[in-house]
Regions:
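A short beta-turn/strand-edge loop motif at beta-sheet boundaries
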Residues: 57-62, 144-148
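Hydrophobic beta-strand segments
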Residues: 64-70, 150-155, 186
Length: 209
């Protein structure tokens, strides 16, 4: 039996999370009014596993960590994608239909939707295909050291005029998914520092500044 805890909170909107050592068991938006609110969670834990592949035939890079997420308007769960594309999302505590998104964890905050899944049993398996192309960019100084925590703008080609705002990680790296081939301009402080051209596969490039 779980523990019961009383909390006194100002009225407003909150995020209620229940976690163990393996991760999130429940994660829900709640609204506190001037009335008493009681929340109970039946924590029957399930899992989702499978494999993610690239539609363009590329493989996952060992140096780029990936997250995979189940999301709906009230609750979310998360897991990691390994180098061979396999993944597992443990501790799913609510049956239902979810959007499935992926994101490189050293890149932008933009998640890419790869499908939906219905969780209605304790064990679910489903594979997903990632459309688009991965840009892996490393910014270095003249000595070859990565330029960490730099705000970078990536401007899309004329066929897809979109700008992505990203911060490099502590190694000077950025990874993000773009939807169309073409030449992308890399800028820092509105100054162009190079281009990356996407043809039919994921692309990695080092840019020295």
């Amino acid at each position: 039996m779980g523990n019961m805890r009383c909390m006194y909170l100002p009225t407003g909107k909150y995020r209620c999370s229940v976690r163990n050592l393996e991760g999130s068991l429940a994660d829900e938006n709640i609204t506190v009014t001037d009335m008493a609110l009681e929340k109970n969670y039946d924590l029957t834990v399930g899992s989702l596993s499978g494999k993610a592949t690239w539609e363009n035939g590329s493989s996952f890079d060992a140096n780029t960590p990936w997250g995979i997420y189940l999301e709906n308007k009230d609750i979310s769960f998360e897991g990691n994608i390994t180098q061979d594309g396999s993944y597992k999302i443990p501790n799913i505590t609510a049956y239902g239909t979810y959007d499935v998104t992926v994101i490189p964890l050293n890149g932008s905050d933009d998640r890419t939707k790869v499908g939906t899944v219905t969780i209605n049993s304790e064990t679910t398996e489903q594979d997903f295909v990632i459309s688009g192309y991965l840009l892996q960019i490393t910014l270095q100084d003249s000595t070859g050291e990565g330029k960490s925590f730099v705000n970078v703008t990536i401007s899309g080609p004329e066929t897809s005029p979109v700008n992505y705002e990203c911060f490099t990680n502590f190694r000077g790296e950025i990874s993000l998914i773009v939807s169309t081939p073409g030449t992308y301009e890399i800028s820092v402080n509105n100054i162009s520092c190079g281009n990356v051209t996407v043809t039919d596969k994921n692309v990695a490039k080092v840019i020295q500044m």
